[in-house]
């Protein structure tokens, strides 16, 4: 009986060592981390890109491009998913740019459109100032001064004081990992594509 008990305890202790390291959240965070190692010039200008799977040149991008490129590591093409959802229900998306129909070149690169998409197809979570409510892989949106929208991905790493999760984002200096979760008013908090792709 003692041998079975020791074997069972040994198995339970070592089982996490054999867990699948390729969980979606791990893939997303690894992709976001990799983005921080690539120099990117902040440029949100309109560009014609391929569809599906289109992207602006690798050396340019904005906050949404960090998210879009990171999700591609999960096999999730937000360009295609946002475009198809906008084609299905254009009125469910903000009318902020004078558009009369979806545009696969730019729609997925606009934070308000991503907010609408994640509300419709992901989990919408609380936007409280409780750092424990923000899990690694969550998406957070903010409104910067001048009501400018911004988006980032919650990291596993914590602030120097251990109080807040760090954020992968691009606010103008290229993709960064920074302690900025509560620096601006939070407009959205979402979880998307981390259990199984919808």
Please place each PLM-identified region on the residue numbering.
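Second-shell loop/turn segments in exported
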Residues: 21, 49-58, 100-104, 125-129, ...
């Amino acid at each position: 009986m003692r041998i079975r008990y020791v074997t069972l305890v040994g198995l339970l202790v070592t089982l996490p060592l054999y867990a699948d390291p390729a969980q979606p959240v791990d893939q997303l965070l690894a992709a976001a981390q990799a983005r921080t190692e690539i120099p990117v010039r902040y440029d949100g200008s309109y560009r014609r890109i391929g569809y599906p799977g289109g992207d602006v040149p690798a050396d340019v991008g904005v906050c949404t491009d960090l998210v879009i490129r990171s999700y591609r590591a999960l096999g999730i093409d937000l360009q295609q998913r946002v475009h198809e959802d906008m084609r299905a229900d254009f009125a469910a998306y903000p009318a902020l740019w004078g558009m009369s129909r979806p545009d696969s070149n730019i729609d997925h690169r606009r934070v308000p459109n991503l907010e609408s998409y994640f509300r419709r197809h992901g989990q919408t979570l609380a936007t409280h100032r409780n750092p424990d409510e923000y899990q690694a892989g969550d998406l957070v949106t903010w409104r910067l001064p001048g009501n400018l929208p911004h988006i980032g991905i919650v990291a596993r790493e914590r602030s120097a004081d251990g109080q807040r999760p760090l954020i992968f984002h691009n606010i103008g200096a290229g993709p960064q990992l920074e302690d900025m979760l509560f620096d601006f008013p939070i407009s959205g908090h979402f979880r998307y594509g981390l259990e199984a792709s919808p």
